[in-house]
């Protein structure tokens, strides 16, 4: 419950998610709240639940989500297969992907969180955004998603293996 309180104190809306990262609330991220009573009811089994945070205008936060070790895709979003028909796993590290992203323009210093799968979330505070969640903002060969309006991310909860880099 300590991490729940941390987000509530920072006025960050949160909601309960199941261990498979799916929402544990009837309306998903639309049930996110900073009301302690509402949040505590959602987290009826906090040891088994993850903390979801709406992105976009719900919290005025946009997240760049970098995945590693995923199947590679071409610029049409189709998985790339080897000669045997098996998916080719992207060998790039987070830092290599960040370097490719920087070629598109500078990345401001921001809070970064290494996810349990080895990926990275880059958090950006925004006053208002018209950006929607999706992949269409980047070269589709980069394993990067934007989490904004219509999306959410799982945030550090003190139980999972997250590493926070706060520049």
What are these model-derived regions, one by one?
Residues 56-78, 83-85, 91, 98, ...:
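DNA replication initiation modules
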Residues 121:
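Histidine-centered active-site/metal-ligand motif
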Residues 1-118:
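Signature for HUH/AEP ssDNA processing cores
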